[in-house]
């Protein structure tokens, strides 16, 4: 009899209950006890949602991030928070955000600002989830504190849950971190493993039979040293009284199959969506006692599983494995929304093609029933699934011959600017007349309660189009006045009218659909609601021109047009799986190209095309990067390069460790790139030690994800560090990212200090010819 289990459940709640509880606590509006109560209620409800499973994950819930929780479980706390005597949860928030609440801290451990320096944040493998990077040094020590995990396990057991604790494995944990002193992370493995032994013993003592130990690092290309680390680690853990389910996901094992199959664990989970080709070889490699868990329901996308086709493949596997077969989603369901049944306004036909987290668990129920008791026992469910899958395949809404013809007509010239960068730069300098070290922002300003209320009322039909436009124009005017008062050089209209940098565009493109409650966690309390790219994409009308033109009418300074690039639109959407992603990306590129042309016709001479998610789409295996970067860069160039030399094209990339893709970024040929660098203390600019980047660059000078306010001198120091690698005449000064999640009382002083820093740098340049 096959068993079912889950690797993890979305923690934010069907109505984003965790988000609102966190933000209330951070603002000082509610107590820690109230926050803990919300967490307990969410865990209880989520365990109920998974009640039909044979094993339910415990420990997948985190108030901020599961990697951060693992750091605290292992006693790996940054020194800068060790002096705080507060609750561990507050210390976790200090590491993640720079402070535990949005009030002044009584301690200051950073020269840059009040509070402490926030931990570095980066993408979780190739997803849109972000984790707080563990910090290591040669002197790092570990000490177990499993109190939170053990409390959740006891909570689940008391609720009658068949609990399977979930932890991040030791090798992946080390790989996820960064050695701040340049020491060898793997040198810490021998210190770390005894803490894992102690943790597993504590879980066994608390009644756990199985522990899921996540090692997604196994789907990446590992050198011999890291492969050996897996053998060392799991031979050290093999005496544990609990049974270990080693979980891999997000890709194929390939050359790591033998390693994964022969590690001394009781079971192995593989992603049978992206790594199906691993399964047949593993069947021959696995010892006869070992469980094989197959992730047969896609945990990263929202399309219904074709249950009939899955059973056709799975039934012979079940015959060979018998009771050693477990089935599950491919990965944690953290990456999909909670419940499709909440969607009361989604197009009915499109809704019938989808499955969110709860529906994916129901798909597991149908699959295991068919495997264990025959397809006849779930014939009605299988028939309904088959009808939905057939309808999607055959729907005329999915295919647009005109769009396919436009993509077929793309030529190499479609992605070429009229002149090389040096020629363009001279024309742009003469036209824009910007000072040295020009200042700008990345696009968005705070989305206030008034803005959100106006948008809600407009969508609910409580105010008409004229009233909504007037409200948005008032907000745009406020943003423009604030920027002029601060002395910024290139302004933005503030994006008051935009709910999300992807959803806003998707709502105006044919081929997209939208949920009301399809939220997924990006980091901490930050949630995104990815659009659903279900068919060929067409732009019926201009999307941003009216708002940008209005913003420009209020100022004599340059106003940036703000667009989301095709690669980011793709990577931050739930993308159709019936054609190559490259094809969908080119369709999106043509829609953005048309919008760029319309902005230019409206007199906009600075246009930013955000590609925040360019790196996110990189395959986990470096050997596959060239293909992805080829079509991604081509798509950006198609979108950006239909303009005159005088029009300055910007692009923005956040959280992008881009040292290893700098040549591809240069090939995009944007006139200006702005990037996230402040959390990494300009380490991201190391790429320029060995690569002469030809165009202009704005290294982010303060971390917008933290409420801390940088000092002018801190910003000056960062830009001086940047000027060691980038010629000062090609440097811009800007925040790391958009400001929509911040408050005006944070934004104004931070930008004021940024402008003050620019003036200091200009004065120094005039006196010495050097920055500052």
Curated annotation (Swiss-Prot):
Residues reported to bind 5-methyltetrahydropteroyltri-L-glutamate: 16-19, 123, 526-527, 572, 616
The protein's required cofactors: Zn(2+)
Catalytic reaction annotation: 5-methyltetrahydropteroyltri-L-glutamate + L-homocysteine = tetrahydropteroyltri-L-glutamate + L-methionine
GO biological process, one term: methionine biosynthetic process
Parts of the chain that traverse the membrane: none
GO molecular function terms listed in the Swiss-Prot or TrEMBL record: 5-methyltetrahydropteroyltriglutamate-homocysteine S-methyltransferase activity; zinc ion binding
Positions bound to L-homocysteine: 442-444, 495, 610
CDD domains: CIMS_C_terminal_like, CIMS_N_terminal_like
Cofactor annotation remark: Binds 1 zinc ion per subunit.
Location of the active site: 705 (proton donor)
Pathway(s) it belongs to: Amino-acid biosynthesis; L-methionine biosynthesis via de novo pathway; L-methionine from L-homocysteine (MetE route): step 1/1
InterPro entries hit by this protein: Cbl-indep_Met_Synth_N, Cobalamin-indep_Met_synthase, Met_Synth_C/arc, UROD/MetE-like_sf
Residue numbers binding Zn(2+): 652, 654, 676, 737
Binding locations of L-methionine: 442-444, 495, 610
Annotated keywords: Amino-acid biosynthesis, Metal-binding, Methionine biosynthesis, Methyltransferase, Repeat, Transferase, Zinc
Taxonomic superkingdom: Bacteria
Gene3D superfamilies cross-referenced by the UniProt entry: 3.20.20.210
E.C. number(s) listed in UniProt: 2.1.1.14
Pfam families assigned to the protein according to its UniProt record, in alphabetical order: Meth_synt_1 (PF08267), Meth_synt_2 (PF01717)
Similarity comment: family membership: Belongs to the vitamin-B12 independent methionine synthase family.
Function in brief: Catalyzes the transfer of a methyl group from 5-methyltetrahydrofolate to homocysteine resulting in methionine formation.
Name of the protein in its database record: 5-methyltetrahydropteroyltriglutamate--homocysteine methyltransferase
Native organism: Thiobacillus denitrificans (strain ATCC 25259 / T1)
Phylogenetic placement of the source organism: Bacteria, Pseudomonadati, Pseudomonadota, Betaproteobacteria, Nitrosomonadales
């Amino acid at each position: 009899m096959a068993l079912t289990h889950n690797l993890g459940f979305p923690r934010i709640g069907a109505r984003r209950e965790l988000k609102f509880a966190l933000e209330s606590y951070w603002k000082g509006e509610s107590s820690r006890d109230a926050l803990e109560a919300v967490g307990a209620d969410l865990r209880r409800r989520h365990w109920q949602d998974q009640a039909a499973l044979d094993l339910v994950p415990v420990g997948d819930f985190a108030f901020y991030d599961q990697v951060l929780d693992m750091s605290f479980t292992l006693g790996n706390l940054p020194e800068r928070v060790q002096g705080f005597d507060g609750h561990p949860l507050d210390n976790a928030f200090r590491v993640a955000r720079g402070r535990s609440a949005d009030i002044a801290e009584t301690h200051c451990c950073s020269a840059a600002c009040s509070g402490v320096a926030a931990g570095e944040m980066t993408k979780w493998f190739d997803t849109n989830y972000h984790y707080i990077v563990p910090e290591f040094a040669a002197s790092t020590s570990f000490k177990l504190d499993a109190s939170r995990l053990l409390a959740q396990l006891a909570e689940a057991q008391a609720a009658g849950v068949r609990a399977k604790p979930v932890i991040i494995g030791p090798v992946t944990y080390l790989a996820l971190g960064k050695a701040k002193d340049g020491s060898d992370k793997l040198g810490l493995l021998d210190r770390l493993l005894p803490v894992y032994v102690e943790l597993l013993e504590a879980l066994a003592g608390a009644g756990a039979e199985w522990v899921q130990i996540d090692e997604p690092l196994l789907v990446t290309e590992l050198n011999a040293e890291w492969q050996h680390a897996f053998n060392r680690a799991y031979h050290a853990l093999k005496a544990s009284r609990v049974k270990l389910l080693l979980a891999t996901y997000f890709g194929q094992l390939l050359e790591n199959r033998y390693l994964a199959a022969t590690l001394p664990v009781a079971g192995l989970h593989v992603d049978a969506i992206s790594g199906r080709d691993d399964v047949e070889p593993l069947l021959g490699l696995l010892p006869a006692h070992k469980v094989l868990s197959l992730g047969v329901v896609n945990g990263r996308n929202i399309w219904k599983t074709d249950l009939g086709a899955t059973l056709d493949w799975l039934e012979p596997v079940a015959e060979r494995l018998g009771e050693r077969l477990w089935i599950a989603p491919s990965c944690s369901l953290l990456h999909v929304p909670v419940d499709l049944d909440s969607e009361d306004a989604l197009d009915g036909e499109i809704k019938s093609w989808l499955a969110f987290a709860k529906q994916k668990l129901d798909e597991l129920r149908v699959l295991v029933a068919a495997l264990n008791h025959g397809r006849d026992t779930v014939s009605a469910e299988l028939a309904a699934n088959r009808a939905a899958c057939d309808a999607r395949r055959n729907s005329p809404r999915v295919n647009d011959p005109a769009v396919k013809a436009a993509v077929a007509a793309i030529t190499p010239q479609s992605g070429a600017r009229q002149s090389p960068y040096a020629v363009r730069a001279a024309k742009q300098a003469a036209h824009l007349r910007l000072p040295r070290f020009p200042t700008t922002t990345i696009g968005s300003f705070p989305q206030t309660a008034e803005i959100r209320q106006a948008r809600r009322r407009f969508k609910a039909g409580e105010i008409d189009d004229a009233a909504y436009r007037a409200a948005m124009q008032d907000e745009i005017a406020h943003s423009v006045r604030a920027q002029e008062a601060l002395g910024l050089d290139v302004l933005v209209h503030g994006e008051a009218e935009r709910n999300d940098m992807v959803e806003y565009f998707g709502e105006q493109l044919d081929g997209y659909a939208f949920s009301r409650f399809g939220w997924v966690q990006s980091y901490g309390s930050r949630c995104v609601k990815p659009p659903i790219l279900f068919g060929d994409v067409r732009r019926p009308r201009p999307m941003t021109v009216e708002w940008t033109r209005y913003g420009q009418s209020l100022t004599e300074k340059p106003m940036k047009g703000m667009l989301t690039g095709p690669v980011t639109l793709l990577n931050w959407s739930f993308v159709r799986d019936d054609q190559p992603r490259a094809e969908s990306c080119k369709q999106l590129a043509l829609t953005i190209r048309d919008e760029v042309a319309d902005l230019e016709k409206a007199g906009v001479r600075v246009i930013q095309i955000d590609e925040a998610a360019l790196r996110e789409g990189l395959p986990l295996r470096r050997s596959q990067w060239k293909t992805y970067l080829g079509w991604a860069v081509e798509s950006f160039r198609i979108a950006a390069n239909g303009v005159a030399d005088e029009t300055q094209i910007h692009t923005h990339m956040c959280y992008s460790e881009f040292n290893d893709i700098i040549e591809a970024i240069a090939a995009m040929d944007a006139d200006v790139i702005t990037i996230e660098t402040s959390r990494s203390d300009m380490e991201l600019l190391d790429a320029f030690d060995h690569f002469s980047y030809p165009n202009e660059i704005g290294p982010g000078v303060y971390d917008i994800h933290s409420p801390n306010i940088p000092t002018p001198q801190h910003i000056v120091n960062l830009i001086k560090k940047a000027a060691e690698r980038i010629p000062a005449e090609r440097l811009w000064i800007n925040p790391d990212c958009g400001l929509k999640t911040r408050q005006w009382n944070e934004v104004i002083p931070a930008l004021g200090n940024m402008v003050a820093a620019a003036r200091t740098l200009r004065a120094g340049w005039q006196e010495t010819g050097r920055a500052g």
